[in-house]
From Swiss-Prot:
Modified residues (N-acetylmethionine): M1
Protein name as it appears in the record: Transmembrane protein 127
UniProt function note: Controls cell proliferation acting as a negative regulator of TOR signaling pathway mediated by mTORC1. May act as a tumor suppressor.
Other facts noted in the record for this chain: Consistent with the observation that mTORC1 signaling regulates cell growth and size in many species, TMEM127 knockdown cells are larger and proliferate at higher rates compared to control cell lines. In contrast, cell proliferation is reduced in cells overexpressing TMEM127.
InterPro entries: TMEM127 (IPR033331), TMEM127_TM (IPR046795)
Any one biological process term the GO annotation gives: regulation of TOR signaling
Domain of life of the native organism: Eukaryota
Gene: TMEM127
Amino acid sequence: MYAPGGAGLPGGRRRRSPGGSALPKQPERSLASALPGALSITALCTALAEPAWLHIHGGTCSRQELGVSDVLGYVHPDLLKDFCMNPQTVLLLRVIAAFCFLGILCSLSAFLLDVFGPKHPALKITRRYAFAHILTVLQCATVIGFSYWASELILAQQQQHKKYHGSQVYVTFAVSFYLVAGAGGASILATAANLLRHYPTEEEEQALELLSEMEENEPYPAEYEVINQFQPPPAYTP
């Protein structure tokens, strides 16, 4: 007997979704959080390379700007001799540099998770709840706190060693400080983009995976069913 096309297709083919389109899948990749993450990485790297972290005026220090690049590795003796900084300030600036490096690593890992969207459960939870972005925000806040502490120590040292008796001494933040603040703000935006995004439940994900496997097992293209409906029935045989 003749079986109508689509009801008993060879190989037990399963139907596609209406219109023959592929089943919708929930992508784990997120451009909305990857873009602020990239800005955060760029800002932190620039802050480390930029020599202008603190601006000094009115003291005996011959330098007008100080940064963490002055204390990475070799510290020039003139910085200590001219009372630009003391050993405690050097240590604080090195701690600031260490937290900047940690912030770059966390922000880079968050960026890679947002771009590639791995399906591993642990990595998926880490990305969805923006743990790496949150760590970047905390590290940027720590850098800002240590920068304020370092500025107070340098200000006190410059007030003790004024260039002239009536010199007005002040220490202000330079471009690198604001770059770190901007990196923290970008990480906050990336965190919000991940946390406010709607994700399917575990049951919905399992259903989507099952339907996707059924779709991949189809031995015939979607057009086969339409063509088969217009084929004439076979000749009658007694």
